[in-house]
Regions:
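C-terminal hydrophobic structural anchor segments
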Residues: 63-83
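C-terminal functional extensions of proteins
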Residues: 1-11, 20, 24, 46, ...
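Pocket-edge structural micro-motifs
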Residues: 36, 68, 104
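Short amphipathic alpha-helical surface micro-motifs
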Residues: 46-49, 81-85
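Active-site rim loops that border cofactor/substrate pockets in soluble metabolic enzymes
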Residues: 4-64
Length: 127
């Protein structure tokens, strides 16, 4: 969960909805690892995270970044897409009774193929 705050050190801003999300996750039984709100560098750098928060639940760098606001997510997505050299798949919107796959007019053929593959993948459990 990416935020301007580190594990609640700022009471306001984007950390508040992310703390709510963490509380909801903590109530469930999940087979994936997650951690409370933190700066992006802390999420991606396990050594930094271990120094700042030795009792954190994560091992290794985060492979999913969650943001409270779409403008922050979009900015980071574009930076990573341009500088990271990785493969972008998404965005995928969830929580509307089913998945929605959103593509931009500038999507590549490969990007559209990736989204089609995800759209055709059955969901074992949704909700």
């Amino acid at each position: 969960m990416c935020s301007q705050s580190q594990f609640g050190n700022q009471g306001e801003g984007s950390g508040s909805p992310l703390r709510t999300a963490i509380r909801i996750l903590d109530e469930g039984n999940h087979d994936f690892c997650y951690e409370g709100e933190m700066n992006i560098d802390t999420a991606l750098d396990p050594d930094l995270r271990a120094r700042l928060f030795p009792d954190n639940r994560m091992e290794g760098p985060a492979n999913v970044l969650v943001f409270a606001h779409a403008d922050a997510a979009s900015g980071v997505r574009n930076i990573l897409k341009m500088k990271g050299g990785g493969l972008e798949v998404g965005p995928i919107l969830m929580g509307m009774g089913n998945r929605a796959h959103v593509v931009s007019p500038s999507i590549t053929a490969r990007g559209l193929l990736n989204m089609a593959a995800i759209a055709g993948t059955p969901v074992a459990q949704y909700g």
